[in-house]
Amino acid sequence: MPNPLQKSLHGYLSKIKKETGKLQLSSSHSFSSSKNWVLGKHPKKLSFSFKHRRRSSKTRFSKEEPVYHQDSAHAATLSDIDRFLEENFKSLCIRDDQEDDQHQARVTKNKEKRESSSDDSDDDDDDDDYRHRFERTWGHAVYDSPKQPPDLLRTERLSPPPGSSEGRPSMETTSTSSERQSRSTLVLPENCIAVLRYTDEPQEDFRQSMVEMMESKLGMRESEVDWDLMEELLFCYLDLNDKKSHKFILSAFVDLIIALREKEKRITRKGHVRSLSTRAARDRLRKRMIMSDN
């Protein structure tokens, strides 16, 4: 009986020894797994794997890179990661000069396109905004003339009401800037209405409008110039228009003043000649009367 008992006991002890070995192996494997998890969650990631790597001619790695064997480690250490980032910093964070130039050119081109499109939309918005403010200021007494191309200067006109029996003052103004102030407090001359008009020759239109207003006020007869009226009209033109249009208004006003000065001089000379001729006629008549008495 000693042999069967010895065999069974030997078998039992061998089983216990095998189970103990399995437990130790499992414990060491779990420790290795926890160690790999602490050092890196992806130990086999190609970005940090240096095992059996072949360096090509274009790689930037140093020749002194450590080559790890299969039994040395399963994951990259923190020092390996730092070395990798340090050696490849330029390739990761710095663009090449050519790429920078191309990127800058694309950014500049896109910016120019946005600015050009925004300028066009701003011009349209300025036109619409100014038209609405013009209509709110002058109410329903607004007549719109056929619109010219957008590159032409835009004008406004104050003209006599339709069907008027007598000539009424008319007034033109231009506007080219988006910075227009509210004109709700402006008082127009009597029997004048505001009319929006477009023109490509603002100075000539201003001058013609001033001439029409003077003729409607003074009539076709030759008489002295009403300078108070001219001053009132000038300030009215300036108040109605933007500052960039003032140069056209002043140029037209100067041209009109020169013409009116010449006209006034002619009227004065004619009156002086008429007075001289009348005095001479009286002197001749007096002499004849004296001679007849004698």
Curated annotation (Swiss-Prot):
NCBIfam families registered for this protein in UniProt: A_thal_3678
Basic and acidic residues bias spans: 61-72, 96-117
Domain OVATE span(s) in chain numbering: 195-259
Tagged with keyword Transcription: yes
Region named Disordered: 49-72, 96-129, 141-185
The name this protein goes by in its record: Transcription repressor OFP14
Main location: nucleus
Sorted UniProt keywords: Nucleus, Repressor, Transcription, Transcription regulation
Any Pfam family matching the protein: Ovate
Compositional bias of kind Acidic residues: 118-128
Function: Transcriptional repressor that may regulate multiple aspects of plant growth and development through the regulation of BEL1-LIKE (BLH) and KNOX TALE (KNAT) homeodomain transcription factors.
GO cellular component: nucleus
Biased composition (Low complexity): 164-185
Record GO biological process: negative regulation of DNA-templated transcription
Skewed-composition ranges (Basic residues): 49-60
Tissue: Expressed in roots, rosette and cauline leaves, shoots, stems, flower buds and siliques.
Compartment(s): Nucleus
Complex formation: Interacts with KNAT2 and KNAT3.
